């Protein structure tokens, strides 16, 4: 916290409790969070916005946004079945108007939970519960893209929720895409297809980079 090397480790356990440890491995005094409603299957996230720390985690249906002591920082009333492969990511509005965390449910609906307490949902298509989702600026235009890898389908939508490009693999990749930035506008996305023993590298327009797959 506060760049003073006062590190904390937050561990979600099967007993539905979140344990807070210091860097020596001792339980932290003053940690007040009691328990979640169901088991947490993803790591606890730490985000810092301005001078405030946000600990964000989700159980099967509920999202929790806490302060560093385990108190509720933002109350959320939205319940949805969380996708097991996708954790929360932080999104800061370009105009500085606010922040939100973003994730998907088991059908691929995108849920924005704003730090103001409001929520927003975007449905682009219907996906399986094992999809991968990322929310990134893929082409350097300072606008975010919705990126889905579901089975053997790769689909990328722009900020206006229009399909930018798609690609169908012969076999289904089993790991999430990896993103590379070589310059402000030169950004690429890599996908490993283990069953084909091939690596795919996509330009930000959806075309395969020269020489790929390899």
Region locations from a protein language model:
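Extracytoplasmic/lumenal domain signature
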Residues: 1-214
């Amino acid at each position: 916290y506060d760049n003073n090397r006062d590190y904390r480790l937050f561990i979600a356990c099967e007993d539905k409790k979140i344990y807070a440890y210091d860097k020596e491995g001792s339980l932290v005094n003053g940690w007040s969070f009691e328990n979640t409603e169901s088991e947490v299957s993803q790591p606890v996230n730490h985000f810092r916005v301005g001078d405030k720390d946000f600990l964000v985690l989700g159980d099967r249906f509920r999202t929790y946004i806490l302060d560093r002591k385990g108190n509720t920082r933002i109350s959320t009333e939205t319940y949805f079945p969380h996708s097991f492969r996708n954790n929360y990511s932080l999104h800061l509005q370009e105009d500085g108007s606010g922040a939100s965390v973003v994730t998907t449910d088991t059908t691929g609906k995108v849920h924005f939970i704003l730090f103001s307490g409001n929520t927003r949902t975007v449905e682009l298509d219907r996906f399986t519960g094992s999809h991968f989702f990322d929310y990134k600026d893929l082409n350097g235009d300072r606008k975010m893209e919705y990126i889905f890898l579901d089975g053997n389908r790769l689909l990328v939508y722009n900020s206006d929720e229009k399909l930018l490009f798609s690609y169908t693999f012969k076999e289904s990749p089993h790991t999430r895409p990896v993103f590379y930035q070589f310059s402000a506008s030169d950004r690429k996305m890599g996908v490993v297809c283990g069953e084909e023993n091939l690596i795919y590298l996509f330009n930000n327009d959806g075309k395969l980079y020269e020489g790929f797959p390899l």
